Amino acid sequence: MTQILETVDKSRLTVNPLLKNKSELGQFFTPSSISIFMACLFSEDKLNNAKVLDAGAGIGSLTSAFLARLISENIGKADLHLLEIDEMLEPYLSETLALFKDYIEINSQIIIDDFIEWAAYSLLDEESLLAKDKQRFTHAILNPPYKKIKSNSKHRKLLRKAGIETVNLYSAFVALTVDLMSDGGEIVFIIPRSFCNGPYFRHFRQHLLNKTSIKHMHLFESRDKAFKDDEVLQENVISKLEKGTVQEDVKISISTDDSFSVIRSYRYPFEKIVQPNDIEKFIHINTTNEETLIEKHPNVCYSLEELNIEVSTGPVVDFRVKENLREMPGEGTVPLFYPNHFVGTSLEYPKMMKKPNAIIRNEKVEKWLYPNGHYVVVKRFSSKEEKRRIVAGVLTPESVNDPVVGFENGLNVLHYNKSGISKEVAYGLYAYLNSTPVDKYFRIFNGHTQVNATDLRTMKFPSRDILISLGKWVIENIENVGQVEIDSKLEELLLNDRGNA
């Protein structure tokens, strides 16, 4: 079998540069090592009489790994449905299946079609065998395409008719696959980790959690290892779901790369993966068996809403108000703050940079301006040079002499009713958000470098009293507040609060 799988992988490398519509179709072929690992995740006791779906089959890399797994388990028959939109790949799919003809009886259908259309129509057509539950799949293995779905597209409308709301082809493929499975059916797929959190994938997460149980999730330590031949830099996760079964503990594994030579594995109660009261249904993937400082302390249990603090995305989208932007402050302008203006506890303003420093105050922009005051800002996008995912800064009213200020769209702003918050709370939030424990905790459930307002709303914070104490300490030691000092002071305050509880 090894020789056959090597042949399929050589074919993958040969065909990859020949793809004419790779970007348009969001095609990324699966390397042999990943295909084999994914095929090994299926339960041994469920492999007989397999009815297999490979959606976005490519040249058949995943199907070949699945067939090799069946053969290794001495199973002599498989029923395959391979869906592929690119008709150029049909002969390669046929060649892949032909490699196995002497080893296993294959009943296969290669369907050259748009999977979303094929699946949605199959589910919506009352006369369809799939819609009538007469023919469902027992196994699905997929590496779906990566491409955004336009809001007014045919795909979006079809998905909505099928009861699915999602924004990317990969989540659409997985959601439809879930609906095409029989109860007890197993689905193994590899997609970007970004589906685990954020508002855009909330409906998708709900769809999965309502209809399946999560059995296993696997991560790679390096974000560029899964599809290195395609130079994909997104962090990917391999997941195994089971349709219609009771949720139990979840296995989390991690490997350094796609050789899978060294794998660490842990088991977690499901409530550690998806917190029971989380309406966003964020999926937390902890890759160590150690509890973070945030998890250790039960007094870190407050949401921003419970602390009477709001968070909003900076409302000024600069390209929409180009005519109002000014390189430097001048008559009739007010400050416009970008992420680059905030460095530690300091505001560097005005600043020589490519971005403007000011915006004309007029009727058009007035609705986006905030009264001057104490605000905490969190950069939405962290740069490669920054060690932390969450990078927070503080605006103080004495930093500028203007009655109102603007925050650009690259910032999240913590405020109260679109006004400033108390000085002590602002500095306390600044220190807490910039702490190492918060960074570690955030990385557990955030698969990308973007920090959204929703991420901050779902985070847990210490009590207002602890934030005030932390803030007072920052104010008193403003010149000597480094990473080590912040981490040490936060732990001290949390331990003292726990001891007094």
UniProtKB/Swiss-Prot annotation:
GO biological process, one term: DNA restriction-modification system
Catalytic activity: a 2'-deoxyadenosine in DNA + S-adenosyl-L-methionine = an N(6)-methyl-2'-deoxyadenosine in DNA + S-adenosyl-L-homocysteine + H(+)
Descriptive protein name: Type II methyltransferase M.BsuBI
PROSITE patterns on file: N6_MTASE (PS00092)
Family from the record: Belongs to the N(4)/N(6)-methyltransferase family.
Signal sequence annotation: none
Top-tier EC class: transferase
GO molecular function per UniProt: DNA binding; site-specific DNA-methyltransferase (adenine-specific) activity
EC numbers for this chain: 2.1.1.72
This protein's UniProt keywords: DNA-binding, Methyltransferase, Restriction system, S-adenosyl-L-methionine, Transferase
InterPro entries, per the entry: DNA_methylase_N6_adenine_CS, MethylTrfase_TaqI-like_dom, N4_N6_ade-DNA_methylase, SAM-dependent_MTases_sf
Source species of the chain: Bacillus subtilis
Superkingdom of source: Bacteria
Parts of the chain that traverse the membrane: none
